[in-house]
């Protein structure tokens, strides 16, 4: 029935009910007509937009694509450097498209392109691609970092930012962090007072420190019981190795013989690892259920497991959801803080003038009237140390723990800077290249914390994702929610290392190697061995 005929039909049904009914029916009809026309226009506009996008060129790609493997042969062992060089030669405006196996993969290396992916069009790019190892290790995945974007992911982020990683909650763990720093200082002091002073393995000490800080936050003061902290360190190390680099099993069709073999190998390792996480979490959750505190406030040092159990019903979380979120806490919390501290100390050793300037700031700020050194710098002492904060920022600029942000995934066709990006494209934002972009940074290869000190001529860069020149923690909907926890962990340790000790390279070495090993995170190849001396 046509709209006009329908209208007259309803008028007849209304009969003599008067002008009010007539007016009501007329209003309903007008509303329906407007909705219909609007829907048609919207549909036509969307269809036209899709056609226009599809007529755009794809982002530039290098020649030499081969059957089956695509451009994989162009990527060397130092993947972050290979991609930078390919982008410089074949990319445009920070966009480079490679086909890795069967999967189109877009590499993003400029602030404007990163802004499109992470902010202006993040509703399209906020999801994650299929990642078999992550799905097994993270229960589905049902964590926060790897889960495809949707309502569960939004609620998971809300849970973390509200209950587990808020500024207030991070501050509630400060006494635990400071106790862990004190233990490390005691070990270094013992080496420094030996005759002669002995070298310490800072890689081992800093890795153990960040592991213990996170373990303590997750399960409380019992984190060293039965060697649990060492077990968490081992499991996290296996996690990172399984997720390292390009997981080729996810880039080839599963019916290919090679892909099938890779899938089987990775699946067996991932399931074995998942079972080990299961065993330890089952035990810990049961202990926490039996010892659950009553009326505990978020201002107390309630550990993460207690917090998750207290809000489990509110958020409708399964036990597997709890476990997946805890895996996130270990992997992100341990690896990133440890690597940043190690790189920071390595850069300070190689740039003595920077270390001396930082030591002067820390020691002058914390000078006491009687000339006695403090036993320990506390977190509340660090607010007036801008060069300390600048040093950590500069370390994150040159050495972001993850050279590429976790992969994004386009869920719809889109356009970036005049190029067509089809749905189903994997997108890797090149955080390492952004931090070394010569069009953005003055002397980008040099370690210069001064660029972050807020003085005339300094670079005013927001670290928390608002400035796309510098995104060590990501940006937009998938920004890392643990940045406050990580920064607090790094800041108090670095301040105490600079306050209590002078540092030297063993033997006659003038500096340390910065040679790197690529993976999910970027690591130095060599252990950081340094000789401490008690600061005068």
UniProtKB/Swiss-Prot annotation:
It is a single-pass membrane protein. Signal peptide: none annotated. Its main location: membrane. The keyword Metal-binding applies. Heme binds at residue 480. GO terms for cellular component: membrane. GO terms for molecular function: heme binding; indolin-2-one monooxygenase activity; iron ion binding; oxidoreductase activity, acting on paired donors, with incorporation or reduction of molecular oxygen, NAD(P)H as one donor, and incorporation of one atom of oxygen. Keywords: Heme, Iron, Membrane, Metal-binding, Monooxygenase, NAD, NADP, Oxidoreductase, Transmembrane, Transmembrane helix. It catalyses: indolin-2-one + reduced [NADPH--hemoprotein reductase] + O2 = 3-hydroxyindolin-2-one + oxidized [NADPH--hemoprotein reductase] + H2O + H(+). It comes from the Eukaryota. The chain crosses the membrane at residues 18-34. Gene3D superfamilies: Cytochrome P450. It is found in: Membrane. Pathway: Secondary metabolite biosynthesis; 2,4-dihydroxy-1,4-benzoxazin-3-one biosynthesis; 2,4-dihydroxy-1,4-benzoxazin-3-one from indoleglycerol phosphate: step 3/5. Its cofactor is heme. Its EC number is 1.14.14.157. Pfam families: p450. InterPro entries: Cyt_P450, Cyt_P450_CS, Cyt_P450_E_grp-I, Cyt_P450_sf. Belongs to the cytochrome P450 family. Catalyzes the conversion of indolin-2-one to 3-hydroxyindolin-2-one. This is Indolin-2-one monooxygenase. It comes from Zea mays (Maize). The lineage of its organism: Eukaryota, Viridiplantae, Streptophyta, Embryophyta, Tracheophyta.
